[in-house]
Amino acid sequence: MFVRWPYPSTATRIEPSMSLSPFHLAIPVHDLPAARRFYGETFGLEEGRSSAQWVDFNFYGHQLVIHEHPKTASQEHASTNPVDGHDVPVPHFGIVLGWEQWEALAGRLRSFGTQFVIEPYIRFQGQVGEQATMFLLDPCGNALEFKAFKDMGQLFAK
């Protein structure tokens, strides 16, 4: 799969990889217009089908669907888990990018004035699984993580 980041604001078309099956993830949002702007404009994700209650997005070749729904308990009472000295929001979802793609995304998000839960940084430096990571919330409280591995071959390494 390849990703070309538009900088700073044009949409990108990401094609699913033939070697990895696209996943489908549906998440609740209590403010559909704000979430639509966030995923469409901030990330430049291509919009697919939609209705008055939901919107499909091409999330790096995967299908992300935002569904309008009242706030959920997980959005009202976020949990965290300590990882590498940071309180990681749980639950969260995201994508593993290439290093340069991650750097471009971090720059894009900063240019939009994004408030990070965990600022972009390098985790597990000098260890197996060294990775760049950042965490943020969408306007409805859903936590996202974007990461890139120094060595992609260590994605599942112990």
Per-range role (PLM):
Residues 143-146:
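Short glycine-/small-residue motifs
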Residues 35-40, 109, 141:
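Conserved active-site tyrosine of GNAT-family acetyltransferases
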Residues 10-12:
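Ala/Thr-enriched low-complexity intrinsically disordered regions
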Residues 16-23, 46-99, 103-137, 148-158:
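Vicinal oxygen chelate
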Residues 29-31, 128:
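Conserved beta-strand-loop-alpha-helix junction that forms the acyl-donor binding cleft
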